């Protein structure tokens, strides 16, 4: 199969060559602080994660219409025409400059799939309105120099490339050729390290009755049913004694970072310790990060047989009540120390990972949308016009994300969105993964 082509475009010195070198299988481009070092379009075989492609680096463009500038524009235009996807790069340190605005208009007129890549984001970064004004519907923050943000870039690339050649190929067998990163998280002393030792049949990780033995995230490469898996044991998450509101203020930043990089998170619960708000906070954080999640109740062998049924009923009630946005999360009851039901956990992880990668064709989506919205109409507005959701498309996977077009998106209530999400989850068999909707106003005022 012919490799997909990704073209890097932007004004001088935004870091195109640095990203080119970062993604290239071999270093090709000269990198220097002097603007305009790259004057030809350069090609290399690129790779991000398991996805390989042809990468093009283009000259930095500015508004000066001299003869050199015209030739640089010709080089860039050819690279844009060749591209299946454009990464339009800007510099977070300098912010949006007039040249960025001119070049974004130049790029958008070719109607190619595009991602706005904000480079040099070594610290936390929030997109302000100036970035949205450039007109791109996908935006990510990275540091090409330090390699941060590349997982988000990978997700956006996979979502944006033509679905019949990239997305469908990956989803048909999402584990093959890929490394499934599974993070084992939870409160201290829930049995995370014991669980991993039982899986790999090796005392690889230090365990004991003391809470908090694991101080940092430990990665273990492993094979399960011909799948390459990276198991990541994390420090137990606990709140600082003075903090009561937000999981983001937990002291275990290493664990939080591991969750951000995970494909699937196993949330380990101690069956002998009541389900606490902290457990639900961790689960909510995983869902908000867009990761898939499997909940595992450990030490099940220590629960009295006469109490197990009531325990399960209460447990499911708490999960469904506090995490209604991800109905159908897999829940398994195990004994890590006795190796009871531990393989079922991995099977659940493989299954939910495939759901997390699920791609639905646009035709099937809109057939479902028409039926579902007609079954439950939105109310009439002033003037007798009804709010309608007329069309939708899937914009990415990991997690499944959808764009819906409406004549009046501001009037669509949260309860109606929940109705659509829950109906979609059932119709397309997508239990237990985050499903994200964004609404866009249709340009046709009569739709």
Curated annotation (Swiss-Prot):
Ranges for domain EngA-type G: 4-165, 180-357
SUPFAM superfamilies: P-loop containing nucleoside triphosphate hydrolases
Pfam family, one: KH_dom-like
Family annotation (InterPro entries): G_ENGA, GTP-bd, GTPase_Der, KH_dom-like, KH_dom-like_a/b, P-loop_NTPase, Small_GTP-bd
Residues engaged in binding GTP 2: 186-193, 233-237, 298-301
Example of a GO biological process term: ribosome biogenesis
Span of domain KH-like: 358-443
Family: Belongs to the TRAFAC class TrmE-Era-EngA-EngB-Septin-like GTPase superfamily. EngA (Der) GTPase family.
Record note on quaternary structure: Associates with the 50S ribosomal subunit.
PANTHER family: GTPASE DER (PTHR43834:SF6)
Protein task: GTPase that plays an essential role in the late steps of ribosome biogenesis.
Name listed for the protein in its UniProt record: GTPase Der
Source species of the chain: Rickettsia rickettsii (strain Sheila Smith)
């Amino acid at each position: 199969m012919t490799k997909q082509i990704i073209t890097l475009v932007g004004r001088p010195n935004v870091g195109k060559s640095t990203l080119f070198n970062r993604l290239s299988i071999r270093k090709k481009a000269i990198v220097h602080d002097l603007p305009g070092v790259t004057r030809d379009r350069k090609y290399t075989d690129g790779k991000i994660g398991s996805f390989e492609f042809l990468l093009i680096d283009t000259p930095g463009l500015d508004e000066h219409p001299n003869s050199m500038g015209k030739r640089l524009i010709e080089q860039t235009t050819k690279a844009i025409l060749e591209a299946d996807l454009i990464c339009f790069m800007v510099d977070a340190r300098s912010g949006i400059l007039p040249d960025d605005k001119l070049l974004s208009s130049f790029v958008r007129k070719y109607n190619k799939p595009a991602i706005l890549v904000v480079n040099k984001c070594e610290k936390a970064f929030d997109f302000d309105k100036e970035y949205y004004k450039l007109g791109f519907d996908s935006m990510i923050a990275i540091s090409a120099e330090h390699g941060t943000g590349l997982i988000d870039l990978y997700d956006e690339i996979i979502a944006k490339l033509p679905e019949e050649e990239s997305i469908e190929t990956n989803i048909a067998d999402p584990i093959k050729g890929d490394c499934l990163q599974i993070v084992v998280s939870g409160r201290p002393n829930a049995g995370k390290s014991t669980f991993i030792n039982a899986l790999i049949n090796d005392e690889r990780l230090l365990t004991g009755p003391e809470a908090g033995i694991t101080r940092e995230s430990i990665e273990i490469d492993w094979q399960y049913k011909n799948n390459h898996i990276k198991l990541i044991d994390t420090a137990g998450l606990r709140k600082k004694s003075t903090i009561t509101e937000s999981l983001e203020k937990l002291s275990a930043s290493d664990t939080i970072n591991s969750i951000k990089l995970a494909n699937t998170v196993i949330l380990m619960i101690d069956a002998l310790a009541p389900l606490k708000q902290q457990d639900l906070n961790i689960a909510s954080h995983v869902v908000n990060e867009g990761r898939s999640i499997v909940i595992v109740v450990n030490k099940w062998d220590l629960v009295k047989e006469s109490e197990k049924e009531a325990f399960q009923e209460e447990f499911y009630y708490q999960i469904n009540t506090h995490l209604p946005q991800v109905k159908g999360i897999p829940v398994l009851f195990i004994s890590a120390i006795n190796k009871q039901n531990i393989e079922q956990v991995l099977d659940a992880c493989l299954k939910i990972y495939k759901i997390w990668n699920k791609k639905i064709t646009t035709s099937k989506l809109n057939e479902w949308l028409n039926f579902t919205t007609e079954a439950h109409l939105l109310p009439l507005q002033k003037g007798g016009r009804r709010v309608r959701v007329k069309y939708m498309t899937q914009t990415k996977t990991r997690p499944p994300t959808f764009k819906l077009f409406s004549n009046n998106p501001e009037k669509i209530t949260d309860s109606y969105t929940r109705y659509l999400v829950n109906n979609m989850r059932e119709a397309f068999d997508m239990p237990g993964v985050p499903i994200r909707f964004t609404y866009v106003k249709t340009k046709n005022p009569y739709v």
